[in-house]
Curated annotation (Swiss-Prot):
Residues 170-184 have a biased composition (Basic and acidic residues). Residues 36-54, 130-142 have a biased composition (Polar residues). Keywords: Acetylation, Cytoplasm, Phosphoprotein. Present with 155 molecules/cell in log phase SD medium. The modification N-acetylmethionine is found at residue 1. GO terms for cellular component: cytoplasm. Residues 1-115, 130-200, 217-238 are annotated as: Disordered. This is Uncharacterized protein YDR239C. It is found in: Cytoplasm. The modification Phosphoserine is found at residues 63, 254, 313, 342, 345, 390, 477, 492, 546, 683, 699. Its main location: cytoplasm. Residues 160-169, 218-230 have a biased composition (Low complexity). The keyword Cytoplasm applies.
């Protein structure tokens, strides 16, 4: 019974200790078994002593307290163990190489020691069958510490991967390749790890991205922005510009969304002044531009409005008597001088320029002489002149060869923000520096928007290289915009005029020559010009409401309200607007509600509290005082104040006097006109008695609220201070208003007694105790009980 209990206890002890404890139990069992031959016992003892020496050499093999030693060894074992098996594939390549070298060295060192042990292990199978825990773990104890669950992953060199990518690939393709590599690595590494479940928000975001991509693919087919049609006519095929590589490309964002990246228009002076290295424009290039307007180079993005209506989605229709209704908007893109080859992602991201109320930059042949007098940079003070050279008989090739427009050397990205009025004008009607004549504005306002007719009547405007610097200097004198944007604006305007080269049979070339001493006029027009008034019905947003005069709030007031009141309902005006704007520009104008009060006998004595305020607020102005109505003559207007003075006998004896003497009676009763508190009864304003009248501000005799109220500063200065060390505040004199500052300083110097230097004199008046001995010590806080 006791033997069985001790055996079970020993088995249980060997269950928790896998190492040397299981060997002890096996040795005890082998001693108790009489059927085991002596040869096998010797071999097992030899093998166990050798393994005990290799695994735990500090424990003697035959010590009586062997279990205690093994228990203490098992407690201290975690301090000597190796680190946990790390399966992170993103370890450094150096660490993984070092670990693999150490592993091979330890295997080579331990392989020599275990050659004899493996030979004895083959003969030891019969003795180890009795205990299931004494498998090959004891013999391979040194191997179990070093052996990993799987070999470390091969080192990855990301630099060699990124350098192997060709130069013509975009950043989008590089990021997609890197993401696919990371995803494959993450899938293989998280085989035995927990996977984070995707939330509903992430699934919704993915669904939205898929929808945006599908919408982008479907809308991209409608936009004819394919650059492969005219690739054979290009003389040079440039690489991808640097601006596209520098721009952060947002994936899964549609090209029409407001989140798409737009590079700011910041151009250095060097890029403006240097000659562009573009190719010469051929004559077939001009014909090709008029035929195919869909090739785009410059990137235009439109800001999305808060109401959801965009300028791109609007198709304004203008009425023309001759040609009927025509669309006021038409899309075309600028000609590309940089080919991207087979890059389809950037070609699909190009935006067409939408020009509303397109204006001819030149005049027709009939109005050439009239346009000379009206257009151009003309200044009366500087007496600038314009050389207008038009050769009617010359062909297009001669015009192109004499002066050819410069193609832009870099890709421009524009941001159209003013979506309500997308037509922009350089100057106004009063400005003589306009580049267009009246005929172009008349055609623009009448609504004739035919692409072929416009381009046939157009004439290219190009500025020579010599005059570009003068235009830059002239624009620098203009103070409307910042200096950083002036060069970029001129560059964009110049490139627009150069790239919009029309195909026409009669090609007229205008060369504007500006002297170096000419300063451009700089008028600042706050009022809307005639130009914007003409084109306003074309550029106004389409609305299904009736077009009657509604006193709506202006956009300036709405901006101010949004600025000052973040949660504004557009019904309250900002605080710093004038009163006229506050009263006349509100959507809901309050009207005076006329209420006739039936005062009962209970309400007569009420002269205080909230009931009086309600009575004052409900009373309206005295309508009988106008005197315009005819039926007011028979009505008796009772003045209770005058009756009260008559009752007290304060009225003058000359009550009924003639009109000549009426002025004296009015002067005698002037005090009745300004009764304090009477404004509350004659107006709708309850707070009228507290407000000062305009006439009383300058009067000295009248006592008003501002005269009687003492400010906090003067009150704190005049208060009597007790318990402070600063007792000189009594001697401080107030600064009067009728004397000068020097008199104040002299009076202050007389009041302050200061110690003077000793003077050697025989005069007895000088010797004074206060001067010789000083004031002495005085107690600042004397005790209340004098001793």
């Amino acid at each position: 019974m006791f033997d069985g209990f001790s055996n079970n206890k020993g088995k249980r002890r060997s269950f928790f200790r896998f190492g040397s404890e299981s060997k002890n139990n096996d040795s005890e069992k082998s001693v108790r078994k009489p059927s085991v031959p002596s040869t096998i016992k010797k071999s097992t003892n030899i093998a166990r002593t050798s393994t005990a020496e290799t695994s735990a050499p500090d424990i003697p093999p035959r010590s009586p307290n062997r279990n205690a030693h093994s228990r203490s060894h098992s407690i201290q074992a975690p301090l000597q163990k190796e680190t946990l098996k790390n399966t992170n594939p993103f370890l450094n390549a150096e660490d993984t190489l070092g670990d693999s070298l150490e592993l091979t060295q330890s295997k080579e060192a331990s392989g020599n020691d275990h050659k004899g042990i493996e030979y004895l292990q083959e003969n030891n199978i019969i003795g180890q069958r009795t205990n299931p825990f004494t498998t090959s773990a004891n013999s391979n104890a040194h191997f179990s510490k070093i052996k990993r669950s799987r070999p470390p992953p091969p080192p990855m060199d990301m630099k060699s991967i990124t350098t192997s990518i060709s130069n013509n690939t975009t950043k989008e393709e590089i990021e997609s390749n890197n993401d696919s590599e990371r995803d494959s690595i993450a899938i293989s590494s998280t085989h035995n790890q927990h996977r984070r479940q995707r939330s509903e928000a992430e699934k919704l975001v993915d669904d939205i991205e898929n929808y945006i991509n599908e919408h982008k693919v479907s809308s991209g087919s409608s936009l004819s922005l394919d650059t492969s049609e005219n690739s054979d006519t290009k003389a040079s095929q440039d690489k991808l510009p640097v601006d596209v590589m520098e721009a952060p490309i947002l994936r899964n964002v549609s090209a029409e969304s407001s989140l798409s990246y737009v590079k700011p228009l910041i151009v250095d002076n060097e890029e403006v002044n240097k000659a562009s290295n573009g190719n010469l424009v051929q004559s077939d290039h001009l014909k090709e531009f008029s035929s195919n307007l869909d090739d785009g180079d410059d990137k235009f993005s439109f800001s999305t409005s808060a109401s959801g209506k965009s300028t791109k989605s609007l198709q304004q229709v203008s009425k023309d008597e001759s040609s009927g209704f025509k669309a006021a908007h038409f899309d075309f893109a600028y000609k590309s001088n940089e080919h991207l080859g087979s890059d389809g992602s950037i070609a699909s991201a190009r935006k067409p320029l939408r020009i509303t109320n397109e204006i001819d930059s030149g005049s027709s042949n009939e109005d050439d002489d009239d346009g000379l007098q009206e257009k151009g940079f003309v200044d009366s003070e500087s007496k600038a002149f314009i050389n207008y050279a038009s050769d009617q008989g010359s062909s297009i090739k001669n015009d192109v060869s004499t002066q050819e427009p410069e193609l832009p050397s870099h890709r421009r990205i524009f941001r159209v923000v003013n979506e309500d009025r997308p037509s922009f004008y350089l100057n106004s009607v009063n400005d003589t520096g306009s580049l267009t004549d009246k005929h172009s504005f008349d055609t623009a306002s009448s609504g004739e928007y035919d692409a072929k007719s416009n381009f046939s009547s157009q004439s290219g405007l190009s500025i020579s290289k010599g005059s570009k610097s003068t235009v830059l200097a002239a624009l620098d004198s203009n103070g409307n915009t910042k200096s950083s944007n002036k060069t970029s604006e001129l560059n964009s305007l110049n490139s627009i005029s150069e790239s919009l080269v029309p195909a026409a049979h009669s090609f007229n070339e205008h060369t504007v020559t500006i002297p170096a001493t000419v300063d451009l006029p700089n008028p600042v027009h706050d009022a809307p010009s005639e130009r914007s008034v003409k084109c306003s019905p074309l550029t106004s947003v389409v609305s299904n409401k009736s077009e009657k005069s509604v006193p709506l709030v202006s956009s300036y007031v709405e901006e101010l309200r949004l600025k000052y009141y973040k949660t504004s309902n557009f019904l309250q005006a900002p605080p710093n607007l004038p009163v006229a704007l506050k009263q006349k520009n509100n959507l809901i104008q309050p009207k005076n509600i006329k209420v006739k009060l039936r005062t009962s006998s209970k309400q007569i004595g009420i002269k205080h509290g909230k009931v009086k305020q309600k009575l004052l607020a409900l009373e309206t102005r005295n309508e009988e005082s106008d005197g315009t109505a005819t039926g007011l003559k028979n009505k008796i207007n009772v003045d209770h104040t005058k009756e009260f003075h008559k009752l007290l006998g304060k009225e003058n004896e000359t009550g009924s006097i003639s009109k000549k003497e009426g002025t004296d009676a009015e002067q005698a009763e002037d005090y009745l006109k300004d009764i304090p508190g009477d404004e509350a009864y004659n107006s709708d304003d309850i707070m009228a008695p507290l407000r000062e009248k305009r006439g009383q501000n300058g009067s000295v005799d009248s006592v008003s609220r501002s005269n009687t109220v003492v400010s906090y500063y003067t009150r704190s200065q005049n208060r009597m201070r007790s318990g402070t060390l600063d007792n000189d505040y009594v001697n401080r004199q107030k600064l009067p208003t009728h004397i000068s500052l020097q008199d104040y300083r002299d009076a202050n110097a007389r009041s302050n007694i200061s110690r003077q230097d000793s003077v050697s004199t025989t005069n007895s008046d000088v010797v004074d105790l206060s001067y010789s001995l000083g004031h002495g010590l005085r107690v600042a806080n004397p005790d209340s009980d004098p001793e």
